[in-house]
Structure formats: structure tokens, C-alpha cells
Amino acid sequence: MKRTYQPSKLVRKRRHGFRARTQTVGGRKVLAARRSKGRKRLSA
């Protein structure tokens, strides 16, 4: 059986990266929440 996690840096950046987050309203909310919480890393 194929495992669910097949690492790829490109896909990781495209799906969960900073620029991907800023492009949608929900993503911007995620960034805002992580900023207010004081997260060291905002996105992948």
C-alpha cells in the first residue's frame, strides 16, 4: 500500500506556503491568527 505522505518541497510550498496563504481570505485569516498567537513560523 502506498503511504499518504510523499514529500515534495514544491507541492509543500504551493499548497501551504506564505504566498498561497496570502492569496485567499481564509489563508490571510490563518496568517493573522498565527501572528496574534506569536508563532515563530507563519507558514511552510
From Swiss-Prot:
This is Large ribosomal subunit protein bL34. The keyword Transcription does not apply. Residues 10-19, 31-44 have a biased composition (Basic residues). Gene3D superfamilies: 1.10.287.3980. GO terms for biological process: translation. Belongs to the bacterial ribosomal protein bL34 family. Keywords: Ribonucleoprotein, Ribosomal protein. The keyword Ribonucleoprotein applies.
